[in-house]
């Protein structure tokens, strides 16, 4: 049987004989000497076939049928598959199992984004910076970083990549036009006040001011000397008299001074910098083509930026000043065109302003008035490098205003670097709740009791004004909206899943009265200024006390004292109950017994409270520590740290309602008081106080008396009453070491009163001096 060579993967039949008529032998240019076989084809020696036999492959030989052409076999398999019936469908369970085993490309992509900290960034791309915590985390992931996720799949920002800053300008190479920033002249009603009257007026406003050459506070807008057009705009907006922060901030800013304004939320800070900005801009030449802005305001959230934008437009309209709002969620191209056309005032979030500065949409050569509003919140969101980058684009002799509800170290450090000789104005207690807001706390058994409570109280709340309800999660917001909608309430929802257009539409309808109830996450907690809100309901408690303060600050805005804030707290939220007690006390509010009982379940709160009490038993005029009082007439009143007051005024008095001093301050005062008492009890040895050889009688004369040593028990003394002098033995004097002194009355100092005035000479410093 002949063999078939494999050429190119196909079987080629070989003829048994060659004939020149049928086949030409292969032509070769070179034939090796050791290869007599010209066509390199192996032959079988015993193969015999007639010369005219037909070629193999025609189907005649039985041996040829044993080998199958691979191409034919492949095509035959395809035909069989085509003719075969379709396979029966798999059961649903098997299909689901197979699907779970497969790696879905979309799912893998989303998982990879989440692992890298960008799972929520797609919805917040170029959306600015929100006050909703979930959206904040997503937006910051675009500009800044990596996230981790808690058990509820909430993002936690743990690291941020640096936003590429804009190189600061070399202002020494730029020739700036001079400008004026002092427009204030005291009216006789202000300059005529005496120093005592000014001090009393500032005390009534609860204002604390520090700085050089501070202008006096005003009593009305007329004292500012505003133009007639601006005064008409102020009256049109319903402003009757300035708020506390405005009374002191307006004359300072109009005088051209830099200011650090620290005031509680809802105090009217916006008008305190918008009104002087109008005067500042109108004094400068008009903008040329591609110039501007003159006034720049930076805010941490798009809601606050939009709110400032609306407020600024009201006062800029009489002067035809152009105001631009620059924040995320809006077309960047439209904002680019608006800035290119020119505007005098820009209200922006730091991230979007940096983007537009890189796009050359605006130039800062004419900017002379810079405002940083809610500076503490901007630092919380990690905007410090962006703020510094923006400040580096503005001329150094600008006027800079910084407003904040709190003053952390980072904000303090920035203020020292970018402000020039600032005046610091503090209104009320830093970081405290608005005392004008009535706070009501309801302790409920569980979350299931919250909705019935809200349905019962809500109609009465709506009669007083608009209602803002805060919930902790977006799902809870949707649930409350659905429940209230079913019962006919005109309600709207606001949270991080809403796009910017729907948020603006919802807020506009809420302001215009289409909706009477707005339920929201913390997206609305900062900067939302709606004067029609009379009631705030904390349906869920805030994650931290600072956010709680800003939540309830949405009512009682700009001096309105009609606001009420309700907080619903359950039995499981004992930790927050203790913090809420401190907040209520600091704001001068009543603390319900139910809330105090709940707070006492918290070990930390209970330990701190017991330490201020100093134990349960009161002293009865005996020395030593541990008593809650001590001494006659002082049973348990003076409450110091761990039951001691040391006569230094550092204890907590329950009747005065004062806030207890920090532990560090108490210990420092304790140390100082003990050292003073220690030093005053000893005198140095000298020739003038020679020991006497005679012992005084037990009935000591009246000249040998000293007051009891104060301070080692709250309200008490060492060995007796502080208000009653005791006859005691004279203090022993110190003698040289070569002559040991015996602890007898013969070694007593006969003149203790004169020797007490002299300082003891120590050979080495004591431990208290180190």
Swiss-Prot record:
UniProt entry keywords in alphabetical sequence: ATP-binding, Helicase, Hydrolase, Nucleotide-binding, RNA-binding
SUPFAM superfamilies: P-loop containing nucleoside triphosphate hydrolases
Disulfide bonds: none
One function term, GO molecular function aspect: RNA helicase activity
SMART domains in the cross-refs: DEXDc (SM00487), HELICc (SM00490)
Motif (Q motif): 219-247
Residues involved in ATP binding: 263-270
Biased composition (Gly residues): 621-635
Domain Helicase ATP-binding residue range list: 250-425
GO cellular component terms, semicolon-separated: nucleus
Family: Belongs to the DEAD box helicase family.
Protein known as: DEAD-box ATP-dependent RNA helicase 24
Organism in which the protein naturally occurs: Oryza sativa subsp. japonica (Rice)
Taxonomic lineage from the root: Eukaryota, Viridiplantae, Streptophyta, Embryophyta, Tracheophyta
